[in-house]
């Protein structure tokens, strides 16, 4: 039985009418302080170590629950790399089952992307050297273990990955990590009475929990200086989409999406964030008034009582994050830049048109289930294609090794925050994409395109893509 559009909207929170310990601010009232993952930055050729291991974490402030993590903590450190560098990365699998890892948004050849061909058995390392040759972007690294991606990400194998370049260094945007520039990783879970995550693969559709977490805790707050605050938003949920807004109706100023800056800041009162999508926003805190980001209405009393006896997909609390300004307004504050990037001239013609239909009641893409040994799509590096992606059941669509522009959504203009290059897009009907093939892949190291609902991808809504190197 497939998840109906109405049920999905109710479950997703879209129906608005209805290596070190993380940094923390001082506790305030019943809200926990926002945990800020430690920063792991590439410097002078030194390798970056990411150890996948069992850990313990307190989601609700009580006893710690057994989880998976990276470098000893739930989720992982925020990795920062710089365009032009060659970064040596050492993944170490200290878990009891095979795992593969990838960095969504990092544009690398298929040999360096991870996935099935780079499966790490227990006790095994993988040490790729990654040439960073792309524009600044907020990416994320996570498990993409074949047929086990959903439980592995749910268990805690995920973290934020930031690419900086000369443009990002010189723009007048907040860039002090953990001070005015924060990673915000949103997930939903189902916790038992002891705060231990529960996970059962749903019979159809994706997994929805009843507890929304940000950086591993519920409804946190963070103290910020008066002025502009930069939030790097990542939806690391298995299937839930969020519609974010401010409790006082102030605006989000969107400056970047999945693969980098927008040409200019876009101002919105509501902000969508599908699974796997990233958005960078600026929030004006200069007036000194506290504000919360919310994801719709929380469960009512009857819904909460019902949730005591059966699993619920309605969020108990929809407060994402509370921003609490402190201190005095600086004597000089930067204005929001009018432009972020120079106008880009896109060269080349569309060489091919494709239609991709994501499975609904049955998983698969264009009626075919993912097969590790089959190439489903062949393209040429350095070319453009026009893809129409269709889904009857709302979900995101993600593709490795490419960047795309959203041209239309169900025949209409896309959301303003979807300007700029992306690798993940929300599909509810038909979405038209202009796809550029940045990197090559190979028969034994193909790129994967898939549903962004992790359970659907695990059940076969994925395909392998061979991108032949440019001459």
UniProtKB/Swiss-Prot annotation:
Plastocyanin-like domain sequence ranges: 229-288
Main localization, broad class: periplasm
Signal peptide coordinates: 1-27
Gene3D superfamilies on file: Cupredoxins - blue copper proteins
Gene Ontology MF: a single term: copper ion binding
CDD domains named in the record: CuRO_2_CueO_FtsP
Localization of this protein: Periplasm
PROSITE patterns in the cross-refs: TAT
Keyword annotations from UniProtKB, A to Z: Cell cycle, Cell division, Periplasm, Signal
Pfam families hit by this protein: Cu-oxidase_2, Cu-oxidase_3, TAT_signal
Statement: the UniProt record of this protein carries the keyword Signal: yes
Coiled-coil spans in chain: none
Domain of life (superkingdom): Bacteria
Record carries keyword Cell division: yes
One example of a Gene Ontology biological process annotation: FtsZ-dependent cytokinesis
Post-translational changes noted in the entry: Predicted to be exported by the Tat system. The position of the signal peptide cleavage has not been experimentally proven.
One Gene Ontology CC term in the entry: outer membrane-bounded periplasmic space
Function: Cell division protein that is required for growth during stress conditions. May be involved in protecting or stabilizing the divisomal assembly under conditions of stress.
Family stated for the protein in its record: Belongs to the FtsP family.
HAMAP family, A to Z: FtsP
Name of the protein in question: Cell division protein FtsP
Gene behind the chain: ftsP
């Amino acid at each position: 039985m497939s998840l109906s559009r109405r049920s999905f909207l109710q479950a997703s929170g879209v129906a608005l009418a209805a290596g070190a310990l993380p940094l923390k601010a001082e506790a305030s009232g019943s809200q926990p302080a926002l945990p800020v993952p430690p920063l792991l930055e590439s410097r002078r050729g030194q390798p970056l170590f990411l150890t996948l291991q069992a850990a313990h974490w307190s989601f609700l402030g009580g006893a710690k629950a057994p989880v998976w993590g990276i470098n000893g903590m739930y989720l992982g450190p925020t990795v920062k790399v710089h365009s032009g560098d060659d970064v040596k990365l050492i993944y170490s699998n200290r878990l009891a089952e095979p795992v593969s890892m990838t960095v969504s948004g990092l544009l690398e050849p298929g040999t360096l992307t991870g996935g099935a061909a780079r499966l790490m058995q227990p006790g095994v390392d993988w040490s790729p050297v990654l040439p960073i040759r792309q524009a600044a972007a907020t990416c994320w690294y996570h498990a993409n273990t074949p047929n086990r991606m959903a439980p592995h990400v749910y268990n805690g194998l995920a973290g934020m990955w930031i690419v900086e370049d000369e443009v990002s260094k010189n723009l007048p945007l907040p860039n002090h990590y953990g001070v005015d520039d924060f990673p915000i990783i949103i997930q939903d879970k189902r916790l038992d009475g002891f705060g231990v995550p529960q996970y059962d693969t749903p019979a159809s559709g994706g997994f929805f929990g009843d507890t929304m977490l940000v950086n591993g805790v519920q409804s946190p707050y963070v103290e910020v200086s008066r002025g502009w605050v930069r939030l790097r938003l990542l939806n690391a949920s298995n299937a839930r989409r969020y519609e974010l807004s401010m409790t006082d109706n102030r605006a989000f100023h969107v400056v970047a999406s999945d693969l980098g800056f927008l040409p200019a800041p876009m101002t919105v009162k509501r902000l969508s964030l599908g699974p796997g999508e990233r958005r960078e926003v600026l929030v004006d805190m200069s007036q000194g008034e506290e504000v919360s980001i919310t994801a719709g209405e929380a469960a009512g009393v009857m819904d909460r009582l019902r949730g005591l006896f059966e699993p619920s997909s309605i969020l108990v609390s929809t407060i994402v994050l509370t921003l609490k300004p402190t201190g005095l307004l600086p004597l000089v504050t930067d204005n929001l830049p009018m432009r972020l990037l120079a106008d880009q001239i896109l060269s080349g013609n569309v060489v091919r048109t494709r239609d991709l239909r994501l499975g609904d009641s049955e998983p698969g893409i264009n009626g075919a289930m993912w097969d590790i040994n089959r190439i489903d799509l062949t393209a040429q590096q350095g070319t453009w294609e026009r893809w129409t992606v269709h889904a009857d059941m709302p979900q995101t669509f993600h593709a490795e090794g490419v960047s795309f522009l959203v041209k239309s959504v169900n025949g209409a203009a896309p959301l303003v925050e979807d300007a700029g290059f992306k690798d993940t897009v929300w599909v509810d009907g038909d979405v038209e994409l202009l796809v550029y093939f940045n990197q090559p892949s190979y028969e034994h190291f193909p790129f994967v395109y898939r549903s962004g609902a992790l359970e659907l991808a695990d059940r076969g809504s994925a395909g392998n893509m061979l991108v032949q190197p440019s001459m």
